[in-house]
């Protein structure tokens, strides 16, 4: 999901194959693109970003980056070059450049790209254990359980916050000046219990072949945090794992300069994998219901 300067919400629907526009009250304003193989048509759109008067859509199925104006007119289409690593995520900076998460065997990198999607330099790199396996006849990509990963987000001012959940190390990066802050927070890891193993194997999309289940190795402990986001005021939130999945959601909040602010317990559940997009004073979230249907919900964030 993404927001433009008028707080119009853009929702990327990979299954239907379009981008849906909503106003601040959730009224459908229109769509961008459609399923197909022609100019400006999608196979499997997986990410959307908006900067200024341009909408950027990454299509995984066609391996292309599409650029539209705010009304949905196609401006350009560029192939996604994955020869130097697999694209996992991209975010637009306020000045029109992009940060792309690229993954190779044993390493995650954050690369800076120009407004025209040409690679400029590496902003961050981290050696990481293998986090996914390919299973089934279609070699479907399945995340491995409780493996430390790199999580990152972009502040409203255009700084990049990157963290490694293996050791709770965090960095704030300026795309031009480099690292401006770095720190490591101490933590006591939770053990991976038998219930965690059973819940993982019973999760959606985890109908693994018997051979994959037998060879799957679970780590002894959980990573330091499960998700990192930057809210609409530039504060950093790291969502912590728990010993019991039924416990309420807990995150730690840091100021924009990295100073620890507080530990917060939420009254409502916050799905760890839910796509979110922040604005000042609130957040839009894609929440999956028990019937498998996804709802787009707006929440107010209070002090």
Tell me the role of every PLM-derived stretch.
Residues 1-303:
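Eukaryotic scaffold repeat domains enriched in small/polar residues
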């Amino acid at each position: 999901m993404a927001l433009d300067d008028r707080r119009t919400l853009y929702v990327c629907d990979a299954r239907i194959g379009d981008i849906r526009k909503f106003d601040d009250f959730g009224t459908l304003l229109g769509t961008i693109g459609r399923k197909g193989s022609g100019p400006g048509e999608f196979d499997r759109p997986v990410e959307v970003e908006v900067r200024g008067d341009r909408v950027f859509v990454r299509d995984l199925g066609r391996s292309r980056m599409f650029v539209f104006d705010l009304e949905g007119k196609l401006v350009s289409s560029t192939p996604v070059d994955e020869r130097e690593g697999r694209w996992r995520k991209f975010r637009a900076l306020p000045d029109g450049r992009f940060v792309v998460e690229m993954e190779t065997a044993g390493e995650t990198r954050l690369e800076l790209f120009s407004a025209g999607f040409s690679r400029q330099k590496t902003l961050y790199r981290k050696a990481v254990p293998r986090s996914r396996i390919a299973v089934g006849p279609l070699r479907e990509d399945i995340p491995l359980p409780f493996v430390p990963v790199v999580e990152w987000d972009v502040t409203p001012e255009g700084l990049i916050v990157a963290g490694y959940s293996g050791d709770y190390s965090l960095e704030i990066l300026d795309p031009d000046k480099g690292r401006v802050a770095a720190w490591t927070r101490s933590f006591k890891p939770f053990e991976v219990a038998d219930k965690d193993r059973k819940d993982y194997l019973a999760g959606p999309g985890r109908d693994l072949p018997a051979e994959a289940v037998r060879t799957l190795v679970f780590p002894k402990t959980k990573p330091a945090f499960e998700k990192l986001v930057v809210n609409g005021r530039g504060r950093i939130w790291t969502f912590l794992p728990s010993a019991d999945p039924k416990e309420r959601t807990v995150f730690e909040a840091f100021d924009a300069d990295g100073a620890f602010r507080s530990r917060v317990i939420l009254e409502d559940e916050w799905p760890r994998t839910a796509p979110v997009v922040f604005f000042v004073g609130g957040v839009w979230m894609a929440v999956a219901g028990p019937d498998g249907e996804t709802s787009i919900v707006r929440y107010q964030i209070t002090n």
